[in-house]
Amino acid sequence: MPSQFDLRIRSVDDVRLYDIVEFHELEAPRLFAQNGALAAQSLRNSGLESIVLAVGDVEYTWDLDDDGSLRIRRGDFGRARADLSEAWFSDLIGNLRSAVAVLVSGEPVMTRGNIMHLIAWESTMRSLVDGWPSYEVGSLSFTDLDGDPLDLSRSFRLEDDPAEMMRFLSQAGFLLLKGVFTTEEVAVMNREVDVLQRSATPEDDTTWYATIAGENEPRCVRVNDLPDGALGISMTERLGGFVGFCEANHEFDHIDVLMKPVDVVEGISDLPWHKDCSLGLHSYQCLQIVCGVSLTASGPDNGQLGVVAGSHRVNLSQFGLSADIDLPQVFISTEPGDVTVHTSCTLHCSTPPIHSPRRVAYSTFMMEGDTKALETRLREVRDQAGRDTFAPS
């Protein structure tokens, strides 16, 4: 039986080019028969009235007809309009790159409207292509193994009942493990982070920088793609057993170290609401399990992880959080040595430190499968965004 944590419906063998005419004229009619009602519901829920997708001089309008059914017709009849390259259109349909990746890349594709219209369209397109229903207000509940309401404030320890922990994680999309690392082990990891930060250079593609108020030189705030043991302690040995309870053959992939200072005025340090699969490859890689080792305390004063409970279970915008979404928002406070766990599809954010810096080391565990080659363009987009300077929101 497939694991509840394995949502993959594509593999590298499914990668192909999608032509705008062939997709709309040949594939869309078949998809309409299967998922047309879901896609219409998704478009209604998105708030998007209409959008034109164009590649060169070929244009198709997506909207709802008078009966409320999804309508796709050739020509420009919509309010928003996205002029895409052949590669971008193909990657969007095939889920190799997403509309959020278009946003982050800075590609000027919106002839009319704004990039949020394309992001809204993508949820509708995923309903049509993949049969993934959009979120309906009030449609999710959270229950424990006994069917009772789930206590979203609950925390666990590694020795707790695996079935209870996996039920919590599968329902909520996040989990807090207390006391995973000792004070001495946290000190070891912090010393290694000190070395990483001192030795970082802007020329290193794996580092991100930000400008701090009152400082002339940008400061390294993130080092990506570190191997197991890079912080002096094996994450596989400490966390691999817990991740194994997912029963989806997850394996350690990499560590990203985040060093979040106070008073960032430029650069990416604290991200707004997003999913880790926001840039693409959801249907090839999710659910990844992301374990965040708290190297400092976290909370309202020095920043913390915020999650939208249950967001990994539904099709909603990959970026930002609509006021219409009624799912619980949970902000997690930690002590050094605690570990937050979230899935790659869980909508989450990071609040900025106010009084003291925050450090966290995120270990990503991925399922077996040769998808590394598909990540190249996504990593280029991600790392370029981290190296460029953006005013924080």
Feature locations, PLM:
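Conserved metal-binding segment of the jelly-roll/cupin
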Residues: T334-L347
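Non-heme Fe(II)-dependent double-stranded beta-helix
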Residues: G147-Q171, K178-L271
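Hydrophobic beta-strand signal
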Residues: V109-M110, L176, V341, Y362
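Non-heme Fe(II)/2-oxoglutarate
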Residues: T346-S393
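Catalytic core of non-heme Fe(II) oxygenases with the double-stranded beta-helix
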Residues: G267-S333, T371-E380
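Feature captures hydrophobic
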Residues: M1-D160
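Short acidic (Asp/Glu) patches
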Residues: S85-L96, L239, I268-L279
